[in-house]
Amino acid sequence: MRLASRFGRYNSIRRERLLTDDELMQFVPSVFSGDKHESRSERYTYIPTINIINKLRDEGFQPFFACQSRVRDLGRREYSKHMLRLRREGHINGQEVPEIILLNSHDGSSSYQMIPGIFRFVCTNGLVCGNNFGEIRVPHKGDIVGQVIEGAYEVLGIFDKVTDNMEAMKEIHLNSDEQHLFGRAALMVRYEDENKTPVTPEQIITPRRWEDKQNDLWTTWQRVQENMIKGGLSGRSASGKNTRTRAITGIDGDIRINKALWVIAEQFRKWKS
């Protein structure tokens, strides 16, 4: 199952401290939207996302990343889709930090959605957990605030399972052939046709820093994720011209690739266990 929301290119901000309201207003003004879009019916319960964020803050959840999709219709800018990544007090620093991913819009294109994720500091990778860990959806009706708060705690309860799987992956060694297979599977997720991939599996599994030279499943996955999301790898197009892989700048694409890579990693974990 894919996310209902579809995002294009976006404005974003990430800090290694709590984001302020001024920063949110500058980069994600739709969080402060004063009303629903005119296309929404009377049954649509409108609550500004900032109200939800403030209630989550009261519960100890703080935003560290925020982004908003760009729209061609300026009349929809105040209602456009946005995403925030929040951390719980007491789980702010570390090599890998659990995050709650909150998505919403006020133009009818998205319900509130909450998905478990992980932020990895060494490479600033923002991971998204696969569907097998679950995600929470809250429609724009009824007690939205209460349901979102409840959903945040449900996602929080998933993190123990996420951490257990992550630690298990760190203990699984992959030989060169297995790493090549992981890279090949990842390329198929993005390009679908092996004949159209501009780079090789060897390139996609190559580390960008010495900390990522380990051969365990977790680190292999991180190398692949960073190379795919950030792009910049030299390769050849289907027509044989020199090219560079593009960074994935759309949130929908980021979510899709991240979820698919998590599924691949889970399959390798089960296969090697």
Question: What kind of feature is each model-predicted range?
Answer:
Residues M1-I47, N54, D58, R70, ...:
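Intrinsically disordered, low-complexity regulatory segments
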Residues M1-R9, G90-V97, L102-S273:
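Intrinsically disordered, low-complexity regions enriched in serine/threonine
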Residues R15, Y44-N51, I144-Q147, G151-E154:
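Short amphipathic alpha-helical segments
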Residues T20-D21, S30, G34-D35, E59, ...:
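Functionally constrained cores in energy, signaling, and assembly domains
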Residues Y46-Y112:
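Amphipathic, interaction-prone secondary-structure segments
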